Amino acid sequence: MMFTFGKPLNFQRWLDDHSDLLRPPVGNQQVWQDSDFIVTVVGGPNFRTDFHDDPMEEFFYQFKGNAYLNIMDRGQMDRVELKEGDIFLLPPHLRHSPQRPEAGSRCLVIERQRPKGMLDGFEWYCLSCNGLVYRVDVQLNSIVTDLPPLFDIFYGNVGLRKCPQCGQVHPGKAAIEAVARGDQP
C-alpha cells in the first residue's frame, strides 16, 4: 500500500524532533509539505503586529499553554482567548493576529491550501486610531517561508508605517519587542 504522506507519525516524537524550530527566532514548522492542508505547529513565545486576512477557515488547537488572537472586526479590536485544550474554527476573512506570550506553548494550526489566484492579505492597523495603515496580498504557499519577507518590507519602511488617517507612525518591530518585554507599544 502506498501512502502519499508516509505512515502515521508519532506526533510527540515529531514535536521533540522539531523543538528547536518551535521557539524564537523561527517559531513554527510545517508537518507535511505539498498536501491539500497546511498543517503547522506554532510555538511560543511569539508576538505579531500584523493581522491575517485568510480567505478560508483556520482551525486552531491550543494543545500546550495559552494564547490569544487579536481580532479586528469592522474597525473594532477584540480578543479571543485560546486556553490549553481549546479548539477554535476561525471564519474566512476575519482579521486576526495570533499572540503566544508563553514560552513553550504549542498550537496546531490547520489551513487549506489556496487555489491559484486566491490571495491572503496581511494588514497592519494604527495603534492610535485603529485605521488601516498597510495591506499586502500574496499567493500563500508556506507561512514559514512566505511571511518573513513581507514583514521585513513593512518594518523596514517608515513611509509604509505612517497611518493615512491620523499620521501616527506604526512602531513596527519595536512593538513586538515592547510586547515581549511586557510593555505597551
Curated annotation (Swiss-Prot):
Description of activity control: Inhibited by Zn(2+), Cu(2+) and Cd(2+).
Catalysed transformations (reactions): 3-hydroxyanthranilate + O2 = (2Z,4Z)-2-amino-3-carboxymuconate 6-semialdehyde
The protein's Enzyme Commission number: 1.13.11.6
Binding positions (substrate): 58, 100, 111
Cofactor: Fe(2+)
InterPro entries: 3hydroanth_dOase (IPR010329), RmlC-like_jellyroll (IPR014710), RmlC_Cupin_sf (IPR011051)
Superkingdom of source: Bacteria
Co-factor: note: Binds 2 Fe(2+) ions per subunit.
Primary enzyme class: oxidoreductase
Disulfide bridges in this chain: none
Binding site residues for O2: 48
Residues binding Fe cation 2, per UniProt: 126, 129, 163, 166
Pathway as given in its UniProt record: Cofactor biosynthesis; NAD(+) biosynthesis; quinolinate from L-kynurenine: step 3/3
Molecular-function GO terms, alphabetical: 3-hydroxyanthranilate 3,4-dioxygenase activity; ferrous iron binding
Annotated residues for binding of Fe cation 1: 52, 58, 96
BP terms from Gene Ontology: anthranilate metabolic process; L-tryptophan catabolic process; NAD biosynthetic process; quinolinate biosynthetic process
Keywords noted in UniProt: Dioxygenase, Iron, Metal-binding, Oxidoreductase, Pyridine nucleotide biosynthesis
Cited function: Catalyzes the oxidative ring opening of 3-hydroxyanthranilate to 2-amino-3-carboxymuconate semialdehyde, which spontaneously cyclizes to quinolinate.
Assembly: Homodimer.
Protein family (similarity comment): Belongs to the 3-HAO family.
The protein's name: 3-hydroxyanthranilate 3,4-dioxygenase
Gene name of this polypeptide: nbaC
